[in-house]
Amino acid sequence: MSDSEDSNFSEEEDSERSSEAEEAEVEEDQRSAAGSEKEEEPEEEEEEEEEYDEEEEEEDDDRPPKKPRHGGFILDEADVDDEYEDEDQWEDGAEDILEKEEIEASNIDNVVLDEDRSGARRLQNLWRDQREEELGEYYMKKYAKSSVGETVYGGSDELSDDITQQQLLPGVKDPNLWTVKCKIGEERATAISLMRKFIAYQFTDTPLQIKSVVAPEHVKGYIYVEAYKQTHVKQAIEGVGNLRLGYWNQQMVPIKEMTDVLKVVKEVANLKPKSWVRLKRGIYKDDIAQVDYVEPSQNTISLKMIPRIDYDRIKARMSLKDWFAKRKKFKRPPQRLFDAEKIRSLGGDVASDGDFLIFEGNRYSRKGFLFKSFAMSAVITEGVKPTLSELEKFEDQPEGIDLEVVTESTGKEREHNFQPGDNVEVCEGELINLQGKVLSVDGNKITIMPKHEDLKDMLEFPAQELRKYFKMGDHVKVIAGRFEGDTGLIVRVEENFVILFSDLTMHELKVLPRDLQLCSETASGVDVGGQHEWGELVQLDPRTVGVIVRLERETFQVLNMHGKVVTVRHQAVTQKKDNRFAVALDSDQNNIHVKDIVKVIDGPHSGREGEIRHLYRSFAFLHCKKLVENGGMFVCKARHLVLAGGSKPRDVTNLTVGGFTPMSPRISSPMHPSAEGQHGGFGSPGGMSRGRGRRDNELIGQTVRISQGPYKGYIGVVKDATESTARVELHSTCQTISVDRQRLTTVDSQRPGGMTSTYGRTPMYGSQTPMYGSGSRTPMYGSQTPLQDGSRTPHYGSQTPLHDGSRTPAQSGAWDPNNPNTPSRAEEEYEYAFDDEPTPSPQAYGGTPNPQTPGYPDPSSPQVNPQYNPQTPGTPAMYNTDQFSPYAAPSPQGSYQPSPSPQSYHQVAPSPAGYQNTHSPASYHPTPSPMAYQASPSPSPVGYSPMTPGAPSPGGYNPHTPGSGIEQNSSDWVTTDIQVKVRDTYLDTQIVGQTGVIRSVTGGMCSVYLKDSEKVVSISSEHLEPITPTKNNKVKVILGEDREATGVLLSIDGEDGIIRMDLEDQQIKILNLRFLGKLLEA
């Protein structure tokens, strides 16, 4: 077919369409004629197509073939090339199916084509017949009243709110939101200040170009500023102090997220009865409460809680103090269950309403709980976990409480803390009580390996169907709650809680099983913030310090210096105290430092040993591994301690005063006996020096005591020595230090240097009697009245100075309790009443250092009760004799009769020169010595003795006053475990007359446990007297050669007692009742 024919075909088709549009309203015969024309067209098209195909085969067509026209919207499939046609392989009937599909497609095309043609004809008629106004009205009705919303929803009234609000959403042409960093807590105030700034600049030349400021409640530290440009934001926030952090950096909020800034989504908690909540405000702020029932319609909730009733206010209101009660500052009353009887006793009116009690408009249960309604906004519902102590307040038995009832937020799963390796137990469902081990955790799905013979495969459970289980002996760690971070060993497992023994504080802790986790490590003892640790010394207030003995999540438990455990918050602990170099003095005047091992000899912790952890003034904090309370920490006074490895109380065989620096010129005088050993230096007898720079081999290996300096009182072994210094290895700290030899004293030596003094011996200088200043003159004291010491006032120190005892300062310094030095300690530093005599020093400086009568050399091994041969005082110059007379002329001391007899066993000579015993072999003291030993100063009367130098006859004893008992001038009778009575001479009248048991003895001081008062006090032995035993009592020998022996008192014969001793032979002995003390019966 030629091009002309093709163009003729297209022209005929166009003219045909136009004629159809023009003849839209002609008669049917004309339409039928047009239809006949349409029937002729397909025939002509078929002929032309055949001709076209023949010509195409003959000629090479350079241009692409023209696509066939189709009147519909469906395009025919592309023809397959002839080379790939395999018609022979088709199944039967396939061609029929294709033909039917082609016929249906052609029918659809014809229908669509008819609709298009009819629409075109109508449009042509409108343009031809109608005027412009009518056309405009036609288009307005067609396009103005129809919209997508009407098409979908059927009308404007039925449109949803979301679609109607679409036009209010921000777009690209609207101002943007910019986030600006702000000071936390000042968001609202900053927004108001920007508003005021905007108003102030509104009518100026440079107004602010921001649109708004948003400060949402839930956003902390940021505000939103609405503006077109970032420069406008910077102009607005310039000069605002709270926004200086965000001046250089503002971030634009994306358009899609701008609506979320103002979106408020409030989740309503799904509260159930018996779930737990906390109050937000008011008098019950932060109190735990249990949900009774919920009223969703009224948005209220009824709670069960522990009431807070101000009983003092009720009492004041019912009295004349009502006006003052109103003016009193408000005080939050403590939590306490409702007590109807107490309210009625105070004058309150309590009514009854069924099962409830009504008081002041509130309802109370019979058990004392308050039931009250609150608004939903007044309670905290999320994340409320009651502690075990709070649960115990709500029920008598915590086992009865459903601990699994927790608050669950809508759409959220309950939190769990399961981890791989935990031992769990199924608590719900068909496999209840099945135990297993957690293998993996995937959200709320827990995979476990069951511990059952028949179940070998892994099982998957929801978290709410599992619970942790533990067995006794497991080592666990607390991962939540009050004791978070603590570790311990499980000692008991109950139904709903576990008891574990803390590794750090050695306390028993009650913890919920869900708050535990198996672990192998031990707690570090450091709090959550890492600022404090267990055992640390902290300051509670300007006058009080303490040691942290328990670390909790929000609080500390601190053992203060007064021995009380207080609970404080972390913020209340102001600062840590560093006392690594603190030094204190123990009861023997030894220096004690941190980390020294000491023993407690007095006070409530008497008998314990421990390591010094902290020293603060006169208090020492010690740690004892055998003590369970407070993790082994306890506090006591430094004067109640004795350094382990330090010097012991000086006995009568020790004349050591080496290394002592005299505080009085009289002591340093060459004639004074205490000064003799100081002139020759250490280890130089008679003051002869060994030479310079040479090693002192004699001193190496000896045990020495340091008498001065920071290590005063320490005992050690000399490793090396020269004529000036010595290297000493200390026993207590195992360290070697260099010490000046002048500060060293051998422990087993009589003097540090020089010879033994003969000062004060009589007869002296050619049998001269009396010796100067000895007090052996006749008449004695010069007609003193009263004669006996006990009745003299003042009793102590009636001479000034009294030899060395009443001098100020004394030899041992202001802290020696043996001397009335000035100044002395303040009374408030003493924990117990000490009457007028504190703990005595091991050595008495108040007497003569050498015996006045008679003279003898220092015995190397003194015996307790050696035999003696009496001699007369006229024996000339007894300088080197071992025999003395117990009936010598009066001297500043007395002596005991060695064997008991019906007569008095005391033979003493009172003298104002000193109150020490004359330590002759007749003394009961186990180690007699030429040194004067002050056992216990006492105001009691001393024994009778002749007042002339002549020796009385053996029978010339002056009998004691009947009922005088044991001579109280000595503490030799004092021993442990015997029952004693407090005498009337004691100052504290509250304990006078009480009986007690001696627990320990230090010098002349006794730690006595009083039965009536149930406390331990420290009392001098002069204020005590032993209780006389009766028949069949267990007794202890307190004097004589059988001292410390025990037995049973079988019978009493006058002043004697018949005793069966507890020794292996159980021999029978007869002893004076004054020699016996009543033992404490178990």
UniProtKB/Swiss-Prot annotation:
SUPFAM superfamilies linked: Translation proteins SH3-like domain
Keyword Transcription regulation in record: yes
GO cellular component, one term: DSIF complex
Modification N6-acetyllysine occurs at: K712
Name this polypeptide is given: Transcription elongation factor SPT5
GO biological process: negative regulation of DNA-templated transcription, elongation; negative regulation of transcription by RNA polymerase II; positive regulation of macroautophagy; positive regulation of transcription elongation by RNA polymerase II; transcription elongation-coupled chromatin remodeling
Keywords in alphabetical order: Acetylation, Activator, Isopeptide bond, Methylation, Nucleus, Phosphoprotein, Repeat, Repressor, Transcription, Transcription regulation, Ubl conjugation
Compositional bias of kind Polar residues: 741-801, 861-884
Region annotation Disordered: where it falls in the sequence: 1-88, 669-694, 741-972
Source taxon at top rank: Eukaryota
Phosphothreonine: residues bearing it: T661, T769, T778, T785, T793, T800, T808, T1028
Origin species: Mus musculus (Mouse)
Compositionally biased spans, kind Pro residues: 851-860
Location of the region described as Interaction with SUPT4H1 and SUPT4H2 in the Swiss-Prot/TrEMBL record: 174-268
Residue ranges of CTR repeats: 748-753, 754-759, 760-765, 766-772, 775-781, 782-788, 790-796, 797-803, 805-811, 838-845, 848-856, 857-863, 875-879, 890-896, 898-905, 910-915, 918-924, 926-933, 937-944
Membership in a protein family: Belongs to the SPT5 family.
Keyword presence, Ubl conjugation: yes
Modified residues (Symmetric dimethylarginine): R692
Residue span of region 9 X 7 AA approximate tandem repeats of G-S-[QR]-T-P-X-[YQ], motif CTR1: 748-811
Subunit: Interacts with SUPT4H1 to form DSIF. DSIF interacts with the positive transcription elongation factor b complex (P-TEFb complex), which is composed of CDK9 and cyclin-T (CCNT1 or CCNT2). DSIF interacts with RNA polymerase II, and this interaction is reduced by phosphorylation of the C-terminal domain (CTD) of POLR2A by P-TEFb. DSIF also interacts with the NELF complex, which is composed of NELFA, NELFB, NELFD and NELFE, and this interaction occurs following prior binding of DSIF to RNA polymerase II.
Modified residues (Omega-N-methylarginine): R690, R692
Amino acid composition bias (Gly residues), ranges on this chain: 678-690
